[in-house]
Each structure stands twice: as structure tokens, then as C-alpha cells.
Amino acid sequence: AALNIDANSRIRNESGFKSIFIPPCTSDSGLCLGAAAWSYFCENGEVPKQSPYLGPNEPTILDQVEDLAKELSERKVIGLVTGRSETGPRALGHRSIIARADNVDLRRTLSEYMKKREWYRPVAPVMLESVAETMLSDYAPGDRLAEYMLGTYHVREEYLDKFSGVVHANGTVRALVLKDNREPLFRILVELLEKY
């Protein structure tokens, strides 16, 4: 149920909770991690924030980020494998298929042909938090659902063309918002793409 982005967004918008956190491993695979976190919390009163990247490790490709940005600017679709793999069902940048967010043809290629998704369920954009604050009308700084693509956000009308390849039929996106320096590769890549 925690992968239901519409339900999560309604909880965020209508529940009155100040903060909602859903871990990236929302299925039964996360039960043992949740039990361990609860035990730690009971003993220590808090649980340190952990990384969602707990899987096998691959070499990072930070030295190739400029080449990646150039390939993306040429409207290419790229398979990305770098660092430790994600835990949970969402591709959070270490095992991902990436493309530009502003191209409807790429949406068809990536979402419908490669990932076999329905036309109304496009893939998700990745953006810096400063961009999310500007382009998404209902994004608030620190929104925890955006850390693992577990909520939807309305795109401001003047920016819909920038998200034409990833926007849902109702004008929302399931965004991965980069905060702090958690993902240096994607952060640098997104910054470089602004040049193209």
C-alpha cells in the first residue's frame, strides 16, 4: 500500500501530519529492516538516517558525468549502473534508465516500449530541490516522500513543457528530488544538463 503515490499524496496533503516518512523498501523486504530500526529506537531513542543504497557495489562513474550529460542532450536513452544498488522497488539513480524529461517521444520509447508501462504512467523526473520548489506547486522543502518517489506533485502550468515526457494526465509528476549532497552524480548531471 505504501507504493500508492496517490494515497501517500492525500495523506501528506490532508492528514495534518507535519512530516511523513516512508522507507524505500515498502514491501515485505523491509520488515526486517523496520524491526531492526524499531529495536534500535527503543534502546537509543532515535534511529540514524540510513542510505537506501545497500546492495552490491559497482564502480562509480563520476569521471564520466560530462559525457553522460552530452549523450542526454542528444536525446539518447542511457542505462546507468553506478555505486551500490538501491533497496526497494524504485530506481533511485544507481540502477536506472535515464533520458530527458522534456520529450514526449522519449516517454513513449522509455515508458511504453522499454518499461512496458501504460501511457498514463510515465517514468519519473529527477530534479534538484531548488528546481522542485520553483516548478512544483505543492512541493515543500524537506518533503520526505520525494526522497524515494513515493508521492505526486503538481507541475506549475508554465513548466509543463519541461516535463512533457514525464507528466501524468492530471498534470502531476512522481518526482525524485535531490536534497543535500546525497547523490553527487545525479546532482552534477542535472546541473550540467541546464547548460544544454
Question: Would you name each region that the model predicts?
Answer:
Residues 2-196:
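Flexible beta->alpha loop and helix N-cap segments adjacent to enzyme active/binding sites
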